[in-house]
Amino acid sequence: MYYIVETKEQLDYLSQHKTDNCFVSVIPQNDNYHPALTEPCLVYYHNGEKGYILPVNHSEAFKLDWEVIKQFITSHKVVRVLDKKYHRYFLPGDNLYDVNFIEYTDETEHDTKVHVDFNRQKYYLKEVNSLIPISKHYEKWENIYKKATEKLVFSKFYQVNEFLNTKFTEVFYQLEKNGIGIDPRKFNKHFETTWKDNSIYGNTVFTQYNLYNLTTRPSNAFNGVNFAALPKGLARESFEPNNNIFVEFDYSAYHPRIIAKMIDYEFETGNPYDEIPKEIMFQNIYGGIRDEYAWFPFFTKLNEWLDEEYKRFKLNMGLRIAGNNIILHRHIKDPNKNKILSYLIQSYETYYNVLALERILKLLEGKKTKIVLYTYDSILLDVDKSEIKKLLPTIKQELEADGFPTHMSVGENYGALVKK
């Protein structure tokens, strides 16, 4: 059978001979566009024996109905993908398994010369991938599949981490697809995007969370804007609610409390900074515990716990972090106790945040209020005024359910938030 499947009859034949497992990549109209702002161009499908191209909207082939293709893909028991969060914009997630969590593959490293030339010269075209020959898309994805096979990511001996593949991925997909409201005039004044259409639609700009970081802490940069480190001051006034008001919840003394939970320590008053001054706390948890402060009970217990954790790390195959995930030794350069503690803090921070966000997303189902931005110790909500009284107390309660107190700030834009 030819590798381009462009009729319903050909797809039916492929369906009759399908296996339980497959590998799929939805190729968008433009790789540089945010997935919320583009549509499928082609689908690369590999059944374990041969790779195929299923055309959706390409200049060289007849179009297969996208709903029929979706039905075909979802009929498989296991669909392996690179980047499940991206594929959730096009496919249901129940049978998607993200092999990037086993071994990350940079798709751009396999771009053909044609891909490179078109993306350099025609990056602004919304449907640039429909101009690149199908044979070149096929060549690229055949190479990616071959390399992934060599890395054994499809092997039954390697399982995708359940927490990362389910809760973690779904939470950040749900957040990301909301976008965040902007005043376009102010935004253009303070931020320089690579190409506006890649991430902006009307009064909304789309963020993009990168989930493939060593400690699982996601970064968030897209189209030339780093949303995880937005400059303070007037630049933040560029972000405005699409509903009525911005409400931010941020955790108080988050990292000291996370550490206390990890080592089973309880602060006497409940506030870490009543026991240890804030400056001393931060110097010692991030820079190593100094001898002159080691007498603090919190630091004494942390030192003992960290000694044992470091011993386990050296004896085992790697560092076990939150979510039953492991960072292998070969991925940790020049390991030491401070680095191990930092990695653990970041992983547990992300883990507890995901659990809280999952609960809040359930609360917001069917509501106008949306979560529009996540940073490591805070979330920003675009709140509808009709939902303020009922929703906000419940959201605060869910955020604090794991024992981490929050502060609430309110403002008409992101630069005008005032603590309440």
Regions found by a protein language model. Name each.
Residues 107, 177, 260-265, 283-287, ...:
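Short, well-ordered loop/turn and helix-capping segments at boundaries between secondary-structure elements
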Residues 89-192, 265-267:
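Mixed-charge, glycine-rich, non-catalytic linkers/tails in nucleic-acid processing enzymes
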